[in-house]
């Protein structure tokens, strides 16, 4: 299915005019949405639990409240807390304070699509999902453009939900560079698949496997790190800028020939079948339930996975090598530390 890119000129209704907006959560996405909307002339308050994020929101000049108080005051409530805590936050502090005609928004469809959160039928449910981390959403807005976004409507109680979604996307700067309409189902399942099979899970597993093959064959770990991890950014940047074509035009003929000959030997039809199994677990809710149940149990699986990952040899080798490369990791100031 082909979708049409939309821009600021396509946002016909200033649906957020006169609305009080509550951004719930002040982390990576929360600070970016809130600051961009404020700079776009919107009336924004913050709802967040006491702690560092609460203090940071006040320091950044926002009227800051508890989640319950912010919900009571607002017409439009955007929930930007981490996926795993949204259900309990919604049930305890947001749901009791919603009114008919309110709009509730999300930047990811996880809790709505898998029905961990059920919003009353007289409340709009929309989505604005920028395709980039919060610090990039903020930085590009300040530079005069933005990050593309997906928007969707799950529930249109007032007849105005799509206008709210599009105007929100405009307010955070996304409509400057392009909007794509989607559904909660499509955004949620595709986003999770991309993260698990390619961008995060697939990529890190591929890098680690390559590192192990080289070191087990007797090659120096430091050299293996450069070959399978450090140079990854250089290749990905070329693909990002101009697709596979630009990457292949930029590498040597030797590398290009090896790409065609050996790539299919690594990513086989069996790997594709494994990817289909990953997608199936996303579609049928197995992954979502496993993730939420692990959180409710105190995160034993996630904690174990993190400990295992931290002890990988490639991580230890990389940490030492990066000390000699002060230019690595200096591209986006310290926004990650501030808002995470």
Curated annotation (Swiss-Prot):
Which sites are catalytic?
A: 108
Could you tell me the keywords of this UniProt record?
Amino-acid biosynthesis, Branched-chain amino acid biosynthesis, Magnesium, Metal-binding, NADP, Oxidoreductase
UniProt key word Amino-acid biosynthesis: yes
- HAMAP family assigned: IlvC
Q: Mind telling me which SUPFAM superfamilies this protein's record contains?
A: 6-phosphogluconate dehydrogenase C-terminal domain-like, NAD(P)-binding Rossmann-fold domains
Stretches assigned to the KARI N-terminal Rossmann domain: 3-182
Q: What is its EC number?
A: 1.1.1.86
GO terms for MF? ketol-acid reductoisomerase activity; magnesium ion binding; NADP binding
What are the binding positions for substrate in this chain?
252
Which residues are listed for NADP(+) binding in this entry? 26-29, 49, 53, 83-86, 134
The note on cofactor binding and number reads:
Binds 2 magnesium ions per subunit.
Q: Which family does the similarity line name?
A: Belongs to the ketol-acid reductoisomerase family.
List the Pfam families hit by this protein, alphabetically: KARI_C (PF01450), KARI_N (PF07991)
Domain called KARI C-terminal knotted: residue spans? 183-328
Q: GO terms for biological process?
A: isoleucine biosynthetic process; L-valine biosynthetic process
Q: Give the source species.
A: Streptococcus pneumoniae serotype 2 (strain D39 / NCTC 7466)
Can you cite an annotated GO cellular component?
cytosol
Task: List positions binding Mg(2+) 1.
Answer: 191, 195
> For this protein, what reaction is catalysed?
(2R)-2,3-dihydroxy-3-methylbutanoate + NADP(+) = (2S)-2-acetolactate + NADPH + H(+); (2R,3R)-2,3-dihydroxy-3-methylpentanoate + NADP(+) = (S)-2-ethyl-2-hydroxy-3-oxobutanoate + NADPH + H(+)
What is the annotated role of this protein in its UniProt record? Involved in the biosynthesis of branched-chain amino acids (BCAA). Catalyzes an alkyl-migration followed by a ketol-acid reduction of (S)-2-acetolactate (S2AL) to yield (R)-2,3-dihydroxy-isovalerate. In the isomerase reaction, S2AL is rearranged via a Mg-dependent methyl migration to produce 3-hydroxy-3-methyl-2-ketobutyrate (HMKB). In the reductase reaction, this 2-ketoacid undergoes a metal-dependent reduction by NADPH to yield (R)-2,3-dihydroxy-isovalerate.
* Cofactor list: Mg(2+)
Q: What is this protein called?
A: Ketol-acid reductoisomerase (NADP(+))
């Amino acid at each position: 299915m082909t979708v049409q890119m939309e821009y600021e000129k396509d946002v016909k209704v200033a649906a957020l005019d006169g609305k009080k907006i509550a951004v719930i959560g002040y982390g990576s996405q929360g600070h970016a949405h809130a600051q961009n909307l404020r700079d776009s002339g919107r009336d924004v308050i913050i709802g967040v639990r006491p702690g560092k994020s609460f203090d940071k929101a006040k320091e950044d000049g926002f009227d800051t409240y508890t989640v319950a108080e912010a919900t009571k005051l607002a017409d439009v409530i955007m929930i930007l807390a981490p996926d795993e805590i949204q259900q309990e936050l919604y049930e305890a502090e947001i749901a009791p304070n919603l009114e008919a005609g309110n709009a509730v928004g999300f930047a990811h469809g996880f809790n709505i699509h898998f029905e961990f959160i059920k919003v009353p039928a007289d409340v709009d449910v929309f989505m604005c999902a920028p395709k980039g981390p919060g610090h990039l959403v903020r930085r590009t807005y300040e530079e005069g453009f933005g990050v593309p976004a997906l928007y969707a409507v799950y529930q249109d109680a007032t007849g105005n939900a799509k206008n709210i979604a599009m105007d929100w996307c405009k307010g955070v700067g996304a409509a400057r560079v392009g909007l794509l309409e989607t559904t909660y189902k499509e955004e949620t399942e595709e986003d999770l698949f991309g993260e698990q099979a390619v961008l995060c899970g697939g990529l890190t597993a591929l890098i680690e496997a390559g590192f192990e093959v080289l070191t087990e064959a007797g090659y120096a770990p430091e050299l293996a790190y450069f070959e399978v991890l450090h140079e990854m950014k250089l290749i990905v940047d070329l693909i990002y800028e101009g697709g596979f074509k630009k990457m292949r035009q930029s590498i040597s003929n030797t590398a290009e020939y090896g790409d065609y000959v050996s790539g299919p030997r690594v990513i086989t039809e069996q790997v594709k079948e494994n990817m289909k199994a990953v997608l199936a677990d996303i579609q049928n809710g197995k992954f979502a339930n496993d993730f939420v149940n692990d959180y409710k149990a105190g995160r034993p699986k996630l904690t174990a996975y993190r400990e295992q990952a931290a002890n990988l040899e490639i991580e230890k080798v990389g940490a030492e090598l990066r000390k000699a490369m002060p230019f690595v990791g200096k591209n986006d100031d310290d926004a990650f530390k501030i808002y995470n």
